[in-house]
């Protein structure tokens, strides 16, 4: 059931509170004053620029959608929306560069505490602190919904709110490898169900031997520089990733296990599992499981899988049930696409963080109040929500007689996708069930729910200031070694790992670990564990 804003705050009290909140937010001059009637003055037209992740679309569909959407935004809040894309090529670097560039044109920022450096960028001053009065006034529906779930506490740093969680949207974002069940069955794997890493070896080799026109896994190593090392560790150890404290681009720090999550470790330094993983990658490299120049390749593995020219792709569960399986059923009939998720052997799967998707307001925004008003509409207004997420009805999507989402005849995701990538405010109350999603979606989610554990690090904020130099030095070491290990480019991976460990020690590994453990101990105490 949709939630509605309760009683209106008295106009005089709200106006006074807003004056104080704006001073607290750095004294920015507001173009959105609140009148005696309690309404916001939106007489000045403003352009709101939202930073999103993904390759900028070129098919014209997003532009057409924005034209329709901006008509509504102009009518409701006298604003229009513009999208700025951080494209997938070198996105980890470019995203942070964009945020810290001082660009005054940016307003709404797509962020996350696990994969988009939300805490780091908060600490570096990239985001504007958001007072509760500000949120109540300019994003009232969002404020009420998040408050009803008591989730603002996950968005606070030094007792101030810095972003808005996408906390009312159901998804599983645990990663794994997508593969063809028909080929897996032909390779001798029972029912074509890969249930352990070793069976990937069987599958890849069969594809290599029997499908000469196919690259078993045409990995885009330039973008996925860690390859399957992290997945192997997830499946072959009890370690659990500690989100938001990556070293460079890599999920380096982990908890010992779900039963001992508050003891910090790193399998890259303290376990033999990385030796085993790198030996398998060496074998796969020698066998030609990926292309020789994999580390320089940045092609679209997913489209290759849809075209039948590669036998695997890597991403998360939601991608599987919303895109991979339905597209493979249509484009590679009988392929029986399946997913081997990391941690299948040992049920090492956590539920997503509530801040896996979130929205922040840029610290350099020239009109943060109007940005919040636009965001509130995108997240809660049905017409705006459908446009930003689905496009134009009758062109990008249609509603079936039973109220489900479908696409017009001839629509092809590869060519006609909207790609607005609004991943920071999706809302289960306004989601429309997609008829093209895999029919087994509910069963897959229900299965995860039987064993997936709550992520123990929701709300963990790590202060890296005292070890920033050491973390940077460690990042340089990992950038040198991890891609080469991940794609089997070292003739003697054990020697390379030992050398990497020596360099990480010299870079300050022990100091960083000690600092992180102190943060973890404080966090454990704060949540009463």
Task: Walk through the language-model features, giving the residues of each.
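Extracytoplasmic/secretory soluble proteins
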Residues: 3-14, 18-529
């Amino acid at each position: 059931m949709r939630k509605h804003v309760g009683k209106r705050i008295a106009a005089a009290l709200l106006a006074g509170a807003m004056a104080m909140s704006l001073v607290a937010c750095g004294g920015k001059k507001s173009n959105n004053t609140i009148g005696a009637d309690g309404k916001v003055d939106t007489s000045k037209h403003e352009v709101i620029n939202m930073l999103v992740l993904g390759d900028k679309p070129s098919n014209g569909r997003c532009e057409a959608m924005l034209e329709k959407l901006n008509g509504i935004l102009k009518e409701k809040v006298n604003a229009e929306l513009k999208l700025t894309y951080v494209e997938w090529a070198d996105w980890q670097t470019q995203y942070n560069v964009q945020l810290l560039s001082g660009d005054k044109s940016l307003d709404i920022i797509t962020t996350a505490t696990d994969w988009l450096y939300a805490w780091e960028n908060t600490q570096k001053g990239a985001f504007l602190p958001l007072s509760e009065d500000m949120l109540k006034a300019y994003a009232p529906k969002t404020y009420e919904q998040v408050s009803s779930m008591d989730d603002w506490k996950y968005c606070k740093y030094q007792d101030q709110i810095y972003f808005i969680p996408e906390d009312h949207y159901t998804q599983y974002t645990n990663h794994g490898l997508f593969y063809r069940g028909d080929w897996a069955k032909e390779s001798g794997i029972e029912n074509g169900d890969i249930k352990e890493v070793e069976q990937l070896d069987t599958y890849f080799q069969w594809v290599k031997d029997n499908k000469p026109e196919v690259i078993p896994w045409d990995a885009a190593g330039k973008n996925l520089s860690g390859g399957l090392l992290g997945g192997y560790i997830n499946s072959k150890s009890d370690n659990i990733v500690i989100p938001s404290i990556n070293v460079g681009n890599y999920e380096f720090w982990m908890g010992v296990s779900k039963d001992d999550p508050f003891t910090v470790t790193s399998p890259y330094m303290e376990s033999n599992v990385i030796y085993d993983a790198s030996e398998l990658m060496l074998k796969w490299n020698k066998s030609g499981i990926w292309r020789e120049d994999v580390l320089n390749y940045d092609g679209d593995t997913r489209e290759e899988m849809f075209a039948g020219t590669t036998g695997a792709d890597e991403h998360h569960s939601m991608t599987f049930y919303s895109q991979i399986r339905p597209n493979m059923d249509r484009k590679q009939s009988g392929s029986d696409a399946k997913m081997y998720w990391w941690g299948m052997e040992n049920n090492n799967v956590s539920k997503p963080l509530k801040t896996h998707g979130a929205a922040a307001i840029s610290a350099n925004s020239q009109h943060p109040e109007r940005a919040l008003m636009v965001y509130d509409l995108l997240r809660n207004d049905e017409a705006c929500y459908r446009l930003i997420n689905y496009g134009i009805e009758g062109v990008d999507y249609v509603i079936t007689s039973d109220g489900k989402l479908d696409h017009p005849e001839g629509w092809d995701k590869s060519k006609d996708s909207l790609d607005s990538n609004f991943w920071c405010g999706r809302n289960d109350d306004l989601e429309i069930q997609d008829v093209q999603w895999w029919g087994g979606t509910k069963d897959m989610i229900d299965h995860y729910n039987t064993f997936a554990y709550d992520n123990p690090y929701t709300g963990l904020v790590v202060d890296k200031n005292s070890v920033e130099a050491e973390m940077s030095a460690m990042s340089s070491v990992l950038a040198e070694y991890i891609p080469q290990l991940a794609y089997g480019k070292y003739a003697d991976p054990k020697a390379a790992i030992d050398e990497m460990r020596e360099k990480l020690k010299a870079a300050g590994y022990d100091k960083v670990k000690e600092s992180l453990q102190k943060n973890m101990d404080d966090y454990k105490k704060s949540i009463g564990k």
